[in-house]
C-alpha cells in the first residue's frame, strides 16, 4: 500500500511542478514589450472601419496628402486643445471648418448616400429665404414670442387675436431688406453666436428645434414650393458629393392658391415624380426612396391611422416607399413598445427604420433600442445609447443592422459636447458594427447636406490612424445598407465608383501641381 501511495504522491508532485512552471510569467523584457505593443496596435488598426480597403497607387498618393493635412490639424489641437475644432460647438467653428483644406477635400469627395434626413430641414437657409420673395406670401408674428407663421394666399388669410396677417413684401419694405432677412434667418435655423449658453439642456433645445418646423410649415407646405424645395435639395445634395437619398417625411397636407388640399398619397407622388424627373436630368444621380416617418406623439387610435396609411402607401408605391419610422423627441414621445402590437400587424414587406437611443438616459428612453431590434428594424436612427445595451449590440452585429450616426445633430441637440467623446468613435474602431454617417436636419444647423458630418467623423470621431480608406468605406456602407434592391445597389456602385475615380484623378493632378 505504502509504495503505491509514495508513487502517487511523487506523480502528483511532478504534475504540480509542471503546472507551476507553466504558470510562471515571463520576466519583464523590453523587446517582448515592443513586440506585444506592435501586435496590439496593428490589431486595432486591422479592426477599424476602412481596414478592408486596399488603395490603388493614385489613392495612396492622395491619401498621403490628406493624412499630412490631418496630422497638421491634430497636432495643432494637441498643442492648443481649446482650439481643436471637433472639441468645440459646431456653430462656433463653422467658419473654420469651411476654410479647412480637409473639409474642402471631403466636400468634393463622392460620399454615396444620405440615409437619415428629414423632409423640411434640408435646404440651405439662403434658399429658404429666397422662397419668401415669391408672390402671394403672407406672414403673422406671435405677439408674445415673435415667432413667424407664413401662408401663401391670393387674399389675406383670416386674422385672429394672435395672428394679424400682412404681406411679406410690405414687411420687408418697412423693416428694410437686410434687417428683415436677418431676423428671418434667426427663425429658420438654430445657428447662433452663443450656442453654449443658449438652450442649455435637452428639453429647451428641443423646444427651439421643434419651433423651426412651425415657422417652416406654412412656407414649405405650399404645393409648388414643396416640389421646388425637394428638387433644390437634390441639387444641393449632388453638389455636396451625394448621389442617393432615403428621405424621412411626415407627409403633411399641402395646399395651393385654389384651395386644393393634397393628401399623403399625393404628396408621395410629388416626391416620386420629382425624383424621376431629376434622374433624367442628372446622369450621375442614383435615385431616392421615401421612409414614412410621422411623429411618435400619438395614442392607440393614432398609431392605427398611421399604420393604415403606410399600408396604403406601400400598395401604391411598393418600390419607392422604403419603410416606416416614428420621429420626435424620444424622451417625450411614446415608446416603441407601446406601439408594438399595431406595428407587428404590418406586412413583413414594410421595413422598419426606427429612431431609437437618441438619448443620454440609461434603462429608460433608451429601451427603444431593445424594442427596435426585436421588432426587426433594418437600421437604427442615431443609436446614441447603443453601448449601454450589450445584447442589442450583439444583435446589431449579427443581423447587420446599420447605425445611422449623425454627429452634428447629436451635438446641437445636447447629447455630446466634444466630438471625441461621441460613441460613434467606438463603431469606427470596430468594423464588425455596421454604420453610416448622416446629417439628420442639416438646414437647421446651416450645414451642408453631408460634408460637415463627414468632417466631424474624420477629425473628431475617428482615430488618428484612420485615413482615406475609412472615408471610402463609409461611402460604400451608405449604399450597402440602403434599402435598394441587389440590382439597384449594383448599378449604384457603378455610378459611385465612376465618380470616385474621377475625384481621385482630379485631386492627384492638383496635389502634383502643388508639389512642383
Swiss-Prot record:
InterPro entries: A_deaminase_dom, A_deaminase_N, ADGF, Ado/ade_deaminase, Metal_Hydrolase
NCBIfam families (UniProt xref): adm_rel
Role played: Catalyzes the deamination of adenosine to inosine.
Co-factor requirement: Zn(2+)
Main subcellular location: secreted
Gene Ontology cellular-component annotations: extracellular space
Assigned keywords, A-Z: Hydrolase, Metal-binding, Secreted, Signal
An annotated Gene Ontology molecular function: metal ion binding
Entry's localization field: Secreted
Domain of life the protein comes from: Eukaryota
Annotated catalysed reactions: adenosine + H2O + H(+) = inosine + NH4(+)
Entry keyword annotation includes Metal-binding: yes
The protein's name in its UniProt record: Adenosine deaminase
Tissue expression: Salivary gland (at protein level).
SUPFAM superfamilies: Metallo-dependent hydrolases (SSF51556)
EC number: 3.5.4.4
Keyword Hydrolase: yes
Signal peptide: 1-20
Gene Ontology annotations of biological process type: adenosine catabolic process; inosine biosynthetic process
Family: Belongs to the metallo-dependent hydrolases superfamily. Adenosine and AMP deaminases family. ADGF subfamily.
Source organism: Phlebotomus duboscqi
Amino acid at each position: 500500500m505504502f509504495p503505491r501511495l509514495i508513487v502517487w504522491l511523487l506523480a502528483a508532485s511532478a504534475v504540480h511542478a509542471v503546472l507551476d512552471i507553466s504558470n510562471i510569467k515571463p520576466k519583464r523584457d523590453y523587446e517582448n514589450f515592443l513586440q506585444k505593443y506592435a501586435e496590439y496596435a496593428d490589431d486595432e488598426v486591422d479592426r477599424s472601419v476602412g481596414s478592408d480597403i486596399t488603395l490603388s497607387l493614385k489613392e495612396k498618393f492622395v491619401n498621403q496628402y490628406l493624412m499630412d493635412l490631418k496630422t497638421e490639424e491634430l497636432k495643432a489641437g494637441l498643442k492648443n486643445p481649446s482650439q481643436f475644432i471637433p472639441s468645440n460647438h459646431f456653430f462656433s467653428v463653422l467658419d473654420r471648418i469651411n476654410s479647412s483644406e480637409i473639409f474642402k477635400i471631403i466636400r468634393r469627395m463622392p460620399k454615396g448616400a444620405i440615409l437619415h434626413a428629414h423632409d423640411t430641414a434640408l435646404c440651405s437657409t439662403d434658399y429658404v429665404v429666397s422662397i419668401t420673395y415669391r408672390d402671394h406670401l403672407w406672414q403673422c408674428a406671435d405677439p408674445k414670442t415673435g415667432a413667424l407663421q407664413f401662408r401663401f394666399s391670393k387674399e389675406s388669410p383670416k386674422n385672429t387675436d394672435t395672428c394679424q396677417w400682412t404681406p411679406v413684401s410690405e414687411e420687408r419694405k418697412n423693416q428694410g431688406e437686410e434687417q428683415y432677412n436677418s431676423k428671418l434667418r434667426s427663425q429658420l435655423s438654430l445657428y447662433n453666436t452663443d450656442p453654449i449658453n443658449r438652450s442649455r439642456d435637452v428639453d429647451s433645445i428641443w423646444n427651439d428645434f421643434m419651433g423651426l418646423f412651425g415657422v417652416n410649415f406654412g412656407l414649405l407646405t405650399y404645393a409648388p414650393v414643396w416640389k421646388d424645395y425637394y428638387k433644390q435639395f437634390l441639387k444641393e445634395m449632388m453638389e455636396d458629393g451625394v448621389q442617393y437619398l432615403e428621405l424621412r417625411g411626415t407627409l403633411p397636407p399641402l395646399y395651393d392658391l385654389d384651395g386644393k388640399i393634397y393628401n399623403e398619397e399625393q404628396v408621395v407622388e410629388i416626391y416620386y415624380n420629382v425624383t424621376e424627373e431629376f434622374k433624367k436630368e442628372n446622369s450621375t444621380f442614383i435615385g431616392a426612396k421615401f421612409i414614412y416617418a410621422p411623429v411618435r406623439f400619438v395614442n392607440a387610435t393614432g398609431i392605427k391611422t398611421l399604420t393604415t396609411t403606410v399600408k396604403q402607401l406601400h400598395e401604391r408605391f411598393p418600390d419607392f416607399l422604403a419603410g416606416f419610422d416614428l420621429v420626435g423627441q424620444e424622451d417625450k414621445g411614446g415608446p416603441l413598445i407601446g406601439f408594438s402590437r399595431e406595428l407587428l400587424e404590418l406586412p413583413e414587406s414594410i421595413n422598419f427604420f426606427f429612431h431609437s437611443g437618441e438619448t443620454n438616459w440609461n434603462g429608460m428612453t433608451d429601451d427603444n433600442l431593445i424594442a427596435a431590434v426585436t421588432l426587426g428594424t433594418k437600421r437604427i436612427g442615431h443609436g446614441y445609447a447603443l453601448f449601454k445595451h450589450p445584447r442589442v449590440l450583439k444583435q446589431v452585429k449579427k443581423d447587420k443592422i446599420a447605425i445611422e450616426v449623425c454627429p452634428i445633430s447629436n451635438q446641437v441637440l445636447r447629447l455630446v459636447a466634444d466630438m471625441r467623446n461621441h460613441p460613434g468613435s467606438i463603431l469606427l474602431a470596430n468594423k464588425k458594427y455596421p454604420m453610416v454617417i448622416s446629417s439628420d436636419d442639416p438646414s437647421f444647423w446651416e450645414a451642408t447636406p453631408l460634408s460637415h458630418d463627414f468632417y466631424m467623423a474624420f477629425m473628431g470621431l475617428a482615430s488618428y490612424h484612420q485615413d482615406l480608406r475609412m472615408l471610402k468605406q463609409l461611402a460604400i456602407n451608405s449604399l450597402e445598407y440602403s434599402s435598394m434592391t441587389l440590382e439597384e445597389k449594383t448599378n449604384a456602385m457603378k455610378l459611385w465608383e465612376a465618380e470616385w475615380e474621377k475625384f481621385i484623378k482630379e485631386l492627384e493632378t492638383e496635389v502634383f501641381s502643388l508639389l512642383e
